[in-house]
Amino acid sequence: MTTFTTRDGTQIYYKDWGSGQPIVFSHGWPLNADSWESQMIFLAAQGYRVIAHDRRGHGRSSQPWSGNDMDTYADDLAQLIEHLDLRDAVLFGFSTGGGEVARYIGRHGTARVAKAGLISAVPPLMLKTEANPGGLPMEVFDGIRQASLADRSQLYKDLASGPFFGFNQPGAKSSAGMVDWFWLQGMAAGHKNAYDCIKAFSETDFTEDLKKIDVPTLVVHGDADQVVPIEASGIASAALVKGSTLKIYSGAPHGLTDTHKDQLNADLLAFIKG
């Protein structure tokens, strides 16, 4: 396995395919780099170098007790980019990974970044507050935590067979393969790491990070996203990132990297080339 070690001694697994302009992918919760394989295979075949890492505590990376927070995730990404000495990189983040990309730019700037993309991403803020009335109430995230402690294997099955891919919608055609794929990745994450990450993706406010993004940015979101509702996320983020492009996928669920992979791949390629 290909890994590098962060300054705090955490081993981070990553895959690095192809050659050309580097495209870096940050994955969602509780998944890992494998969740981006459709996009990676497609873009590598188009002449790009594609890189994706397993966030600390997820997949094949180390499972440290501490450091399961967005600042550390962003710093891990920065160290990966520095380790590989990437320049002119395009950063794509899905769901929690979109927060990681935003926080990376907020903390480390865009000296090594050419463009960015937020896909079904959690910014600006998932949690409902007085300043963010369109967010989700704390009870939603407390429920996820409780379900994780009670039977996280079943939680991942329920998420994947229900709202994540939109399989709970009338007329939806479920895929047992997608459900198994989500579950397999989720169960590879450390339980403590995945548990802590719920707080990281739900309570981190990325508003100021988004305002610091000064490179061309693509925001992609499904208008049927039941996990990260579009109004308080994709639409709000696009309004905060100066000059961003918002693409709304009609009827698309949260997990559109799988359900709408061909459409997304084409849009990512056009954005990179544009």
Curated annotation (Swiss-Prot):
<dbReference type="InterPro" id="IPR000073">
    <property type="entry name" value="AB_hydrolase_1"/>
</dbReference>
<comment type="subunit">
    <text>Homodimer.</text>
</comment>
<comment type="similarity">
    <text>Belongs to the AB hydrolase superfamily. Bacterial non-heme haloperoxidase / perhydrolase family.</text>
</comment>
<keyword id="KW-0560">Oxidoreductase</keyword>
<dbReference type="Pfam" id="PF00561">
    <property type="entry name" value="Abhydrolase_1"/>
</dbReference>
<feature type="domain" description="AB hydrolase-1">
    <location>
        <begin position="22"/>
        <end position="254"/>
    </location>
</feature>
<keyword id="KW-0868">Chloride</keyword>
<feature type="active site">
    <location>
        <position position="225"/>
    </location>
</feature>
<dbReference type="GO" id="GO:0016691">
    <property type="term" value="F:chloride peroxidase activity"/>
</dbReference>
<dbReference type="InterPro" id="IPR050471">
    <property type="entry name" value="AB_hydrolase"/>
</dbReference>
<dbReference type="InterPro" id="IPR029058">
    <property type="entry name" value="AB_hydrolase_fold"/>
</dbReference>
<feature type="active site">
    <location>
        <position position="254"/>
    </location>
</feature>
<feature type="active site">
    <location>
        <position position="95"/>
    </location>
</feature>
<protein>
    <recommendedName>
        <fullName>Non-heme chloroperoxidase</fullName>
        <ecNumber>1.11.1.-</ecNumber>
    </recommendedName>
</protein>
<keyword id="KW-0575">Peroxidase</keyword>
<dbReference type="InterPro" id="IPR000639">
    <property type="entry name" value="Epox_hydrolase-like"/>
</dbReference>
